[in-house]
Amino acid sequence: SAQGSSSKSAESSNNDSYTVKILAPGDASTDDCAKISEAASKITEEKFNTKIEVTRVGFGSYDQQVNLTLASSEKLDLMYEYCGNVTSAISSGQILPITDYLDSYGSDMKSEISESDWKCVTFNGNIYGVPSNKEKATGWGFAMNKEMADATGIDYSSIKTEEELEPLLEKVKEMYPDVYPIVSHVGSMSLMANSDDLGGDIGSLESVSSDSTEVINYYATDKYMNEMKLRYDWAQKGLIMPDASTSTEMANSLIGSGKGFGRFTNTKPGIEQEIEKESGKEIVVLDLVEPYTTTTRVDIVWYVPHNSDKPERAVQVLNEIYTNPDLANILINGLEGTHYEFTDKDNGVINYPDGVTASNTGYTSLPWAWPNEAISYVWEGNDPDIWDQTQEFNNNAVVSPAKGFAWDNTDVQNEVTACANVTAKYGPALECGSLDPETTIPKFLDELKAAGADTIIAEKQRQLDDWLEANK
């Protein structure tokens, strides 16, 4: 292994002064990043003779920044990324394997992270990243304006399926004719399904609650047809906002401005508070699909790019961020008195200081985007034990029989691109109720076939079968 050559050389390189450069998402000013880097470095310099330099880039241009950096020789040691974006970067050597460094430099993370989560970031026998310790499962449901829902007089606590929403939506339309009962989120509406998309592109397991490992085209299932018929019917009845699939507005803003009553959403502990924070309305969420976990749900991963001069030092710092609450809080929440203040120190609850808001802070707090939100302070409005609830949510989720399988689409790139274009043409419009599924889905399936969907499905089935065989 890399550090096994001689512990002496590892030791001497480990005493040299080194700066670990970190790229993370979210809005932050250069000045604030510099102050935070300085505060974080105090911890790592004393321990490892290592400084930290944090750069943050807003979500709109983050992926572009990652691609530019990976393609350049500019030094970078640690970066956040959605796992689905990196298979090609891994196969082209732009991201480094870290297997050889974990025992000596990342042993705390190694033991704290579950075997099935490590599998999700393992390619060709090598571990390539560290999965973020956030919710790693999802349920699906419907989030709605509580005041309006209560005013209908309908007992919504008994609603357990998407179909059962209809009487409530009808009543809202009748009582609030100027409000859209359902709004989309930037032109899309989530499906209320528990399929496993096996890492994206076409080809899924129809339901994680079954043992079947047959890879199918989800768009060809009765389940998809029936859900699309329901949505089309609702759109015809005026229960879904018109132009839902072409809207560029965020669902929570539409609910906040009073234009919308409800939206489909992922569910997890604290989802109500999250939507309340963004919409300014009291929210209630109905659970329609019970929580489940797949490889795709282990979706935020920290990587060591090829342009790190000392990957072992990057892994060492990552291990410290994952396990040291003092360091994690500086990087996640910023500086006390500037970016946050305690409202309940005993329970580790924080809020913005006077005059600071979510929109004017110099350092946005995004706990889930960092390696381990579970050791950070909790923002006011959330349950103080939100992180314990999240662990419980993860532990109780239905586990897909393919969790840990990592899809590599390298050999079917042309088909993947062609199918993605077809899916973009029909998917959102069907899912928002804008197209008649009985006439549209057959066309959709024909075009997917012509684009090479069967080739992708066969390749995915082959890889999945190999993986299942190797992981018996």
Description of each model-found segment:
Residues 122-190, 206-246, 306-313, 320, ...:
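Helix-loop-helix "hinge/cap" segment bordering the ligand-binding cleft or interdomain interface
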Residues 16-20, 48-52, 73-77, 123-128, ...:
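Loop/turn elements at helix/coil->beta-strand transitions in domains of secreted/extracellular proteins
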Residues 313-434:
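Conserved small-residue motifs centered on glycine
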Residues 63-75, 167-174, 249-260:
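Short helices/loops that flank or line small-molecule/ion binding pockets
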Residues 283, 381-387, 469-472:
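Long amphipathic alpha-helical coiled-coil segments
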